[in-house]
Amino acid sequence: MDRSSVPDRLGRFFLPDPRSKFLGARWLFLRALGVFHFSVFYSLAHQIRGLVGDAGILPCSELFAFLHARLGISRYFLVPSLLWLAPNDGGLVALVLAGLYFSLLLILNVAPRVSLVVCGVCFLSFVAAARDFSSYQSEGMLLDATAAAFLLAPRGFRPGLGAACPPSRAARFLVLWEGFRIYFESGIAKLASGDPTWRNLKAMDHYYENGPLPTWIGWWAQQLPEGFHRFTAGATLAIELVVVFGVFFSRRRVRLVTFAILTLLQLGIIATANYCFLNHLVLATGFLLVADDDLPFRLPEAVRYVPTKLRLRASAIWIGWLFYASIAVFAFAGAPEPISFLGFPASVLEPFRLANRYGLFARMTNVRYEIEFEASTDGVTYVTYPFKYKPQALDEAPGIYAPYQPRFEWNLWFCAIDEEGVPVQRVQRVARLTCPWVIRVESRLLERSPFVLALFKDDPLHGAKPRYVRAMLYRYWMTDPRALRATGKYWRREFIDQYIDEAYDEE
């Protein structure tokens, strides 16, 4: 073999590929990414001031004041956020408006690279400042996908399909690599977690009942026979650990079969549970398995495009750094931490939430606990604050609203699962350690903060000021079709205990 062939081939890997047959897949993936960003900022438009605003649950101004007092110039690197410029309601609203505007431009295929940068920076600015309300794996997935998509996207203001700027094989590989890692690392994490339900295939027995925000389809799926749940548990492991390797094959049949199987898995999850944009995003990475020739219509051919040496080198460095950093977390999926010499590139990217570790559904929850808030004007009669999305009313069917993400209600589910296996007498003590922000919710409700009240469906006191607010813990079960016909109820529940200390007005 000619020695020059290796660097030549490596160079062609990073160059825009004039023979690319994935113009349509790239176009669709970028439009989908715009939709996901729009859903994020749209949901934040309704929640952000209640979550981290000046009168919210965890004001970002408190975080920035704390960091400013204790850190030097490194604070801008450790917490990269535009909110350093204005850590207040005005800055939060500006962030959301910019995100909405540029995500809409990305959907419309206007200046896709610029739109991706602005969407990514605005989203990172929120994630870095939101503490408990941005601690999900989906955050890292979206930021990873946005960073990879920047290298995949065509240049120009109105590039159309981007035939004049075809994607490089390296950029396409980076997106597929993220999708592969999400699947494979999640499969490894399931086996490495020590949860016996994945090994004995009982993990899905109560999955639909105990997940964060189920749908009405999930309610019916829970009623299916035990054999179905065993099959889906085994199929999930097989797909995540074996089938997903098909993303690296170029043969048409392997690509399309892999795409079909992965898509069916994600559609099943989307139909039965509301995981915001998470599964939509994972599904969208699979678009890049479908070539233009696989479509029933013809698309324009890619043309030769040669970038400047500076752009080519910058692209190669960015792709190489992201890939190398992700190798650290991929190679040690299921381990506590990657070894240091591999972990350094990932540690540099960590403040930017890039090259993340994934491990979806590594441990399954065995019970469903729910927290709800009650208020009283006299300390005797209490009324309940109704939620917008999560299970509460026993006769209300679970809804479908993903990719919208109700972060407040989502976080309450995570607080509640911390109580699994905790003796009743220790519930409040554990809650103070794991979710102290719940007390802040009580305090804001005492103050009648309009932005925190807006996180609920309505005000049960109809404008009256509460003197007492408390959080109560319940255990929930799904009913069955016979009980539904007899009582009209989708849920039954049992009171467990007061979740955390009651807040009261001393005046």
Label each residue range with its predicted role:
Residues 2-507:
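Alpha-helical membrane-anchoring segments
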